[in-house]
Every structure is written in structure tokens, then in C-alpha cells.
Amino acid sequence: MKFETPSRFKFTPYLEREYQFGLDPNRPLCRGFLQFDGCPRGNSCPDKHLAPTFLNKIVCKHWLRGLCKKGLNCEFLHEYNLQKMPECQFYVKNGFCTQSPDCQYLHIDPASKIPVCFNYEKGFCKMGPECSRKHIRRMPCELYMTGFCPKGRVCEFAHPKFVGIYDYMIIKPNPKDKAKDETKQETKEEALQ
């Protein structure tokens, strides 16, 4: 006698209705929920209810294991997206991962987190190779150097910042000289009349 497990439990409809479990993640978005900030059908609606806080978040670590109890009220993403996965803490601490390449968390290169050296971007860093910041070598943009680059920030070449290099001294006129100029102006006006 062969024993088969049931594919659905008695409480499965309750989970689908109350927590949206087991529903197709690719189902269409509910228009009523998007337009009116609420669906009249509530939890019995077969369409997807997406809150605006859902967008651009990291994936819920509990949902990945099938243990998230918040359902649609969860502030994290319930979608398998490799770019939005939480960062692998083991990789952060040790520089390698024992689960790699099967690790479902994000592995970010530690060198990419080092901030850019502003002095090197301007043209010269006196710290040289001992600098704790990142030195990125890029060719300067010829168009930018001659005055204007139409590509702007999306240009693949460097646009060096010349902040603070040309600090000219501001010359203020002497108050006595200003008074002399005013008297000269008055005499010219009198002569014209």
C-alpha cells in the first residue's frame, strides 16, 4: 500500500486568504488597490496588493526560508531578486563564503565600499599609494577641459573638479577712493547741465 501526502491541507485556503500564501507572485496588480489606496474585496481579492513601501527594498530573509508571518504587511520584498538580496554577513566578516556559489545572499566586493579620494580626483594626492581612499585613474574628458561636455555626468571620461584652485582675492575699494569717485561724478554732471 502506497501512502501519498495530500497536496493541500485543510488550512491552506485560510493561509491563501489571510496571508496571501501560495498565490502566484506574477498575478496582476489590483487596480482598485492602486487607485484608491485600498481594495473593497480586502484579503479575498485574487490580485496582488503592493504597498509603495514595497518598492526598492531588500528581500525578506524570513520569506526566503518560507517563514515570514507578515505577508503583504512586510516592509521587505517578497520576490526572488538577486540584486535586492540582503548582504551575506559571513562574506562581510571573512572575505569569502562557504556557501559560494550557491549562497542566496549578496556578495559585495569590499573594495567597492572604499570612498573615492577627492584630492586624486582633482589631480594629485600627496598620500600616494599609502592613501586609505580609492584612486581611480581615468582619462580627462577633452570636451570638458575645453569648456563643455554634452554628456555631463554620464560621460565615461573624467571631469576633474577645480574647486578651490582659483580662489582670487576679492579687492574692496577704499572708502576714501569711493568718496573721490562720487565727487568726480557730481562735477561731471554739473558740467553737463
Swiss-Prot record:
A GO cellular-component term linked to this record: cytosol
One Gene Ontology term from the biological process aspect of the record: mRNA processing
Segments forming C3H1-type zinc fingers: 24-52, 54-81, 82-110, 111-138, 140-162
Disulfide bonds: none
Keyword set includes Metal-binding: yes
MF GO annotations: RNA binding; zinc ion binding
Pfam family, one: zf-CCCH
Protein localization: Nucleus
Family of this protein: Belongs to the CPSF4/YTH1 family.
Name of this protein: mRNA 3'-end-processing protein YTH1
Lineage summary: Eukaryota, Fungi, Dikarya, Ascomycota, Saccharomycotina
